[in-house]
Structure formats: C-alpha cells, structure tokens
Amino acid sequence: MPTKLDEARDVLARANRMIANEGVLDAFGHVTMRHPTDPNRYLMSRSRGPELVQPEDIHEFTLDSQILKPIEARLYGERVIHGEIYKARPDVNAVCHHHASSILPFCISGMELKPVFHLGATLGPKVPFWDARDDFGDTTLIVAKPEEGASLARALGPNWIVLMRRHGATVAGTTLEELVFRTIYTARNAALQIEAHGLGHVSPLNPTETQLAGEYNLKPGPVARAWEYWSVRLDKAEGTWTPPKAKIAAKPASAKRVPRKSGKKRKR
C-alpha cells in the first residue's frame, strides 16, 4: 500500500510535468513541496528537466537544503531558494521557480506585474522585485548560496510571487494544487498584460477585486477543476490518457411500449 510519502512523490512528479506541459517550465526550473509528515523537510527532484521528472527522482531534503540520503546523481544548484522560503514561511507548502518567457520582460524592464484579469488575481495585491545586487553586488544571477536564498525569501515577504532581476520568478502556495494554479495563471496574466499594454493604458484589478477574485479562484472547486484539466492534457501529451467509457442510459419507464389489449379489431 502506498505511503503518504509515496503519494507525495507521485503528485510532485506530476506537478513538475504538468507545469512544463503548459509551457511555463522548460529545461530549467523546479517544483517542490513540503514533506507530508515532517514540516522540517521538503521534497525535490534530482537535477533534470521538469518535463522528465518521475516519482523515483524525488528525494528528501532538510530546510538547509541538504539531501537526507546522498545519491550519485546531480542535485539542483538553486535548491536553497526552496529551503529558505520554507524556513521563512510556515504557511508555504509548495514552491516553483521558473523562467517563463512571458515573465522575463518584467524581470528585465522592472515593469510592475499586476493582476489584469480575474484568474490572474491569485498573484495577490503585490509582486515584489528582487535584485541580487542590493545585497551581493554583481553575481552569476544564480541563487546557489543559503544567504542568497534567504535574501530572496525576505524579498518575497508575505506575498506569493517574487520577480528576480534578469532571471525569472519564484511562486509559493499553501498547497501543491494551489501552486500549480497560481504558477500557470501568473504566466498567462503576464502575457495578457504585455499584449494589452501594446493597445494602450492597462487598468489592473483594483485591490478589492484582487482580493475577492483571488479568494474565489482558490476555492477547492476551481482549483480541482483546473488540476483535472491540466492533468488530462498531460496524459494526452504523454499518450497515457484513456477516454472514459460512455454510459448507456436505461430507458425511462414512461418510454416503455405498452402492449395492446387483445380483442377483435373494430370495423371501420
């Protein structure tokens, strides 16, 4: 019988592939979740493209981003992003770091990313901008040191997304399903904001709309619906989807044929 850890590995591997299948992750980037029974650990794949991640690739790490059981395979160099956020934010149970092409223009230009349609409201009221130079001067732009991860976590603060200068974005969620929802719709919101900006003035959602729409979007129903949709799209892409068999409805009693009474035919 699968344990909670086995189930977590399965769903985390699927989340990696789902986000990649939707075009947000490519060869780089990573998705993690907090350990299902030990909040002082988190789960993360060995270093490989998210689209390739399988349950057996998932390993346990401490919040200092040290692997519990050493392996020969390479590990992600930026895993400190995840460990430091889990340290700083007990309410966060899943994290995604990505370099989506729709997000990068905001990381390059410094333009503020704002929710511009209802499903983008899960961005939250503020998306902070982190510049590694403020604390560390010129760097490789890779977040590989614990102090760099801690600086990024401070920049995230109580928010759910932080943009990283000339690098990408880091997204947080209270659950893995919420994280997938927020990550995918953040990228789509960014694309729409850029497209709308080309037409003229962009009017984002106001604070009340952002709060109300964000809360509505993250109800169990919408989150589960989106997860199922992206999950089936992944299965189709991987060639593992089997369409459900259509059920043949029984005829209602009123539609049954009533036998004609026996007797002589009437003469016309």
Regions found by a protein language model. Name each.
Residues 1-268:
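Glycine-rich flexible loops
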